[in-house]
Amino acid sequence: MTGFSPLGWCGLALLALAGCGAPATPVPAPAAKPPAPIDQLNRIVEAYWDEHKPTEHAISPQFLADSLSIERRYLTQLTGVPRDQLDASSRLTYDIFGRRLEIAVEGFTFPDELLPIDPFDGMPQQLAARSEQLAHDAAAAPAAYDEWLRGIDDYVRWTQQAIANMRQGIRRGYTSPRTVVERMLPILERLGVDDSANPFYAPLRSMPDSIKAAERARLTKDLTSAIADKLLPANRALHDFLQKEYLPRARAGLALSGLPLGSQWYAYRIKRTIGTPLSADDINRIGVAEVERLGSPPAHEATPAPANGLVNAYRDLEVPVQAALPALFSELPKSSFEIRGAEWLPQPATALYYEPGGPNGVPPAIVYVIAGKGARPLSIAGFLQAGLPGRHLQIALQQERADLPRFRRFGAEAAFTDGWGLYAVSLGEALGLYPDESSKSDAAAAEMRCAVALVVDTGLHAKGWTRGQAFDYLRTHLGVDDPDAQSLIDWYATNPAEAMACMMGGMKFRALRAHAQQLLGGRFDLREFHHEILKDGAMPLDILEAKMKAWMDASK
């Protein structure tokens, strides 16, 4: 029994005595009962989330030092939880949390903060995406706009710290590749222009009618001032620094192994991405074997760009996809996503970019269609990969699981999510969504892109490949044009090992399904398999494998 004051206990326990005066000899209070292991674990993971939310863009020395201290402290606390006394669900939490802490602590060995520029998914683009999300949130309250204002202040501090870090990187021999910096410049130039088309002004164009006139006037004034006087100058300052001071000192090579501790750094990034201690040589061999297995898909002319526009074509495609999903999934996310164009994003070879939404779909998730300069065909496989039943389905279901600890509900695991996206492409035929040879060829090409990434990524970062070698390999096995090939090479250079997540994760999902079908035979139910895969959220692949094998054994 808890929650009683000493006086209360006196009234209950000593009622039969002559009075409630203090006893002659003090009686020591009973020792507090230690929390049950499950409660102990839950307290630890929730306290961690409250103390150290995933603000991965904070790159100041003080923040990094504090973060390392926090990660170590919680890792020590976790070792005090008796894992063998936990139930199956809590053991998953224990294992996932422990792995993430270990990976995080090891990561502080390497100075990622000295290379903050990413022309594909960098802080400026993420801030622009948040602005677009707020603009399309029909239920946004004034508090959401005030939070956006605070986000602008945080971003300005980030740009200042990024410049300071890059100057330190120059002194220490850590700089980004020249081509990566060159690719970042037009993005910052576009996001630094003071005109109404700038995505940062989007929230001003569509405030919900529910916001009262006085609040609307205040927010409009404050946002206009913050954007014009803080945010846009910060982007211009970052642009000018990159162009005038950093670009002349940027490195000519692409390989992470060309930097101090580069080989160890790359090995760590492989482990962080795929969750297993495979070497670059191991990954390269797997990639070569997969490229050979897939061979050259039959050549088919791509479907021409739709007359009603690419964005509208993807919106139209969502209707039959939604209708087909219940055949393979017993649970679908409640939150939807929006499909929009994004001229301010760089042109990647995939042409679709997924931005997760907030809890319960507020703000909404977005699939961005990046048409680029030339006309692009509709890609059914790309939509399945980025939207449904791919990344959106997996991430939205995870976010809607209110029973999961918050670090799992809102955390990320690249090999799981990207691998699920590739696995989703393989479901297109069963869903009846590949009506012709062109769409089937497009699906095969999506798998080949992920296989090729294993070879090119390891080639660039561990095997001394030149840009020309990477270009030739991409042209030979993907048939992509020059801009797409160059874009892919710069993406691999910017994000070493991240491209491995797609193929390594996709292979794991296919292997688990094949094993389940073989083991369960006629009892195998694909809807149940998908439910079991997704219901606990993203996790490292080896932990997923152990979980699924336990499910298979219980289902026999």
Residue positions per predicted region:
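N-terminal secretory signal peptides that target proteins for export/translocation
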Residues: 1-4
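Bacterial N-terminal signal peptides
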Residues: 8-19
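N-terminal maturation segment of proteins
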Residues: 20-556
